[in-house]
Amino acid sequence: MEPEEQSTLVVLTTGKEAFVRANAVLQMTLMVRKTAQSPVELLLLGQGVEVLRSNQKNSPQFEQQLAGLREAGVQIAVCEVSLESLGLTKDQMFEAEAVKGGVEVATRLQEGWHVLTF
């Protein structure tokens, strides 16, 4: 019996305060995409939106990892409510689709996606 294709939403709520953890989640997201060959989306929520900041010390490394995720076909989304609550704007960030995080998670759950939160 063939396994069903299972889409995965990875939610990153850890920001620059835990660089090693955020880095590990980005690497794990890439491995899920390459291994599963099914849709994978990375949602940056809460402090996790800081990974997208283009003007911080670790920006070059995050930019490289995000580019690798995009090349592998991972959709990258950022919670616009989190951006606003942290006083950040989209022009301070690397490219990502702006979504309402709670709505995105609820939608993906209704669609049967696995949701992994870090």
Locate the predicted segments by residue:
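Basic/polar N-terminal segments that are highly enriched at the extreme N-terminus
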Residues: M1-E4
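Anion (oxyanion) recognition and catalysis
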Residues: R33-K34, R70, L109-Q110
